[in-house]
Amino acid sequence: MKRRIVAQMAILALSLSAPVLAVTHAPQAAAADGNIIHVSAEGGSDAGDGTAAKPLQTIGAALKKAGGGDTIELANGTYREGELAVDKGVTIKAAEGAKPVLTGAEVPKSWSAGGDGKWSTGKDMVRFCTVCTINADPTKEGIAAHPEQVFVDGKPLTQVLSRAEVTESTFYVDDPDPVTLKNPKNNQAGYNVKPHRGTSYVIGVDPNQHQVEVVQHSRALSFNTDNIALSGLTVEKYSAVQRWDYEDPEIGTISGGGMVVAAH
């Protein structure tokens, strides 16, 4: 089965951070006689019909439109999407000569200067669970419990735990209402669930002078059926939490695992 080859590409339950996964080889297309759905992050619209003349803009819209055996063909560009479920046997591939990138990082549009050489996003950024650790006591994990990521001009910043520590090479997540535990020393006792959004990111460089990307997705793709093929797609910058049992109010338990192949 094609899914077996995908699994061999080491993307089962993979947490995708600074390193990237370049999917450059895949088995034959899901079906030679299926439809081709064209997608262009830069020149498409999800109001389009998926033809070459009117491509869709997102992979998510293409997956909804596709039927079993179809091919989703990606034009060059950056696709800022996540939590995508592949429930049909489709091929997702780069168009000829294209090098598409699927990333979980967004480029915030709203920043405010703090007057102290630091800049903050709005307070509507994604809240990641920082107590969802394999260790039942998250305090023993330290900074490793925090899955958040920020990139400036493509280079990762180092996360710190206070605004005072923010420099040009570090960032801080200001979360006034983080996910907490019912038992502070044992996350297996359950979580106090909080809204999906409500945090702010603080950096020490002027975002008007740089490209700043903040990871806002936990998982890239979930493969939920057989006969799925990928080709020519780079996948990068996803922030999966360590445990899979946190019920996020928007994305449920798929905050664990950067990319997942469900076994049949």
Regions found by a protein language model. Give the residues of each.
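Secretory targeting and sorting signals
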Residues: 2-25
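Extracellular polysaccharide-degrading/modifying enzymes targeting complex plant/algal/animal polysaccharides
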Residues: 38-262
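Low-complexity, acidic Ser/Thr/Pro-rich repeat tracts that form intrinsically disordered stalk/linker regions
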Residues: 25-35
